[in-house]
């Protein structure tokens, strides 16, 4: 029996069925005004297409989607998608670029991910809360810039650009938060 959840109870990471699609909540907000039903706005990812949209769900009752997750490691890019290998069975699967629109910015060789499936259908991957990545290129630090928390631009192999502290150099490994793509700290 499918579990029904109220829209107001949705949180980041929850998955649900809505209008024939499977969505995963990225962010949500709930506004309750007097004499009215609460308004739930969710930034969601369509797990079939990879599209990210905003859905307004006021008083909706939604069917929770039960997603199966299995740990896999990124092996290589086959030209049409990314190939992941199950560490236990050595099974390999290819996931099209379209299903990894955001995640592809942070996946490097050897990255461990959770591959998501719904009723046997491949839905994409879920990244860990923090990832260790390699800086391919970083701008030079500006001499004399003593502003607290001064940053500069840096790039990953995927061409993802983000801000890092002035002391980070090309070739260094850093920790990022893949949910927003921001620098967290130096890798040890």
Curated annotation (Swiss-Prot):
Species for this entry: Ureaplasma parvum serovar 3 (strain ATCC 700970)
Entry keyword ATP-binding: no
Domain of life per record: Bacteria
Keywords: Cytoplasm, Elongation factor, Protein biosynthesis
Gene: efp
A biological-process GO annotation: peptide biosynthetic process
HAMAP family for this protein: EF_P
NCBIfam families: efp (TIGR00038), PRK00529.1 (NF001810)
A GO-annotated cellular component: cytoplasm
Name listed for the protein in its UniProt record: Elongation factor P
Localization of this protein: Cytoplasm
Keyword Metal-binding part of the UniProt annotation: no
CDD domains documented for this protein: S1_EF-P_repeat_1 (cd04470), S1_EF-P_repeat_2 (cd05794)
Function: Involved in peptide bond synthesis. Stimulates efficient translation and peptide-bond synthesis on native or reconstituted 70S ribosomes in vitro. Probably functions indirectly by altering the affinity of the ribosome for aminoacyl-tRNA, thus increasing their reactivity as acceptors for peptidyl transferase.
């Amino acid at each position: 029996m499918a579990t029904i959840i109220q829209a107001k109870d949705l949180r980041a990471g929850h998955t649900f069925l809505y209008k024939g699609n499977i969505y995963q909540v990225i962010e949500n907000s709930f506004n309750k005004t007097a004499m009215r039903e609460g308004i739930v706005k969710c930034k969601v990812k369509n797990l079939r297409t990879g599209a990210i949209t905003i859905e307004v769900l006021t008083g909706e009752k939604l069917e929770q989607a039960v997603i199966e997750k299995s740990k896999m490691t990124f092996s290589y890019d086959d030209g049409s998608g990314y190939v992941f290998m199950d560490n236990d069975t050595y099974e390999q699967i290819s996931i099209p670029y379209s299903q990894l629109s955001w995640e592809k910015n942070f996946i490097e060789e050897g990255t461990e991910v959770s591959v998501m499936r719904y009723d046997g259908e491949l839905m994409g991957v879920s990244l860990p809360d923090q990832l260790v990545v390699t800086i391919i290129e970083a701008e030079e630090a500006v001499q004399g810039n003593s502003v607290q928390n001064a940053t500069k631009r840096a790039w990953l192999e995927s061409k993802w650009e983000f801000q890092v502290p002035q002391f980070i150099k090309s070739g260094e490994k850093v920790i990022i938060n893949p949910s927003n793509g921001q620098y967290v700290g130096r890798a040890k």
